[in-house]
């Protein structure tokens, strides 16, 4: 079943057109990746879906509802959460305080269960619960950013460059956790410059070039595509 459908969206930063007719889908429980070079429009696509940088034209449908003009905070409530590039943790707040912000639109006993779930996924966050986020390593901050997004109980998790600037051993752990999150029923739309890693994690992918979808296929086909190999896989 299609959970997210993006249809011919164009997104602008002032006079600059960053997205030039992007269309894509994500099914319930699926992992889909966007790959491409810097400036291809990957992060802007996530920002448009999440409502942070609204699309100028086109439509975005989530769970059967048009969310193209829905404010970002309402999109979170409807079930889409973004873990942004660069993590954007609040450095002077503790791990627990950062996580609590992810649930600030929610009420009820389920929040305590979600803290437990995040701590089960990322034991380091439990160990550093009272530590200031600004004193943590890049990998730990990435765990915190993903954990904070999960506190919103999303149906769709948007991950923007989760391996950026992180030691390889922590990249492995984060991708293991992404797999666990997906197996729990959360669909994931993943942006990565590490195309090998992204295609290994996803069932399908879209290659973006200068704000357009240049290629869309299953991950195995993209892995074997000579153009993708030359441009993004280092082969």
Residues covered by each model-derived region:
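Glycine-rich phosphate-binding loops of nucleotide-dependent enzymes
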Residues: 2-235
């Amino acid at each position: 079943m299609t959970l997210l459908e993006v249809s011919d969206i164009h997104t602008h930063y002032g006079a600059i057109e960053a997205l030039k007719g992007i269309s894509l889908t994500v099914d319930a429980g699926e992992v889909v990746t966007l790959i491409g070079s810097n400036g291809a429009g990957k992060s802007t696509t996530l920002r448009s879906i999440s409502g942070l940088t609204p699309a100028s034209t086109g439509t975005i449908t989530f769970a059967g509802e048009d969310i193209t003009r829905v404010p970002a905070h309402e999109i979170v409530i409807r079930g889409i959460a973004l873990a942004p590039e660069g993590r954007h943790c609040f450095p002077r707040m503790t791990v627990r305080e950062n996580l609590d912000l992810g649930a600030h639109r929610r009420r009820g006993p389920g929040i305590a269960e979600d803290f437990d779930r995040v701590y089960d996924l990322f034991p380091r966050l439990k160990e550093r619960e009272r530590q200031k986020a600004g004193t943590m390593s890049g990998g730990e901050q990435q765990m915190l950013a993903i954990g904070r997004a999960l506190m919103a109980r999303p149906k769709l998790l948007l991950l923007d460059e989760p391996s950026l600037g992180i030691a390889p051993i922590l990249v492995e752990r984060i991708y293991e956790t992404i797999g666990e999150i997906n197996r729990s029923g959360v669909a994931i739309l993943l942006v990565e410059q590490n195309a090998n890693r992204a295609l290994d994690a996803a069932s399908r992918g879209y290659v973006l070039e200068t704000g357009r979808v240049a290629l869309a296929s299953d991950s195995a086909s993209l892995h074997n595509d000579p153009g993708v190999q030359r441009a993004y896989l280092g082969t």
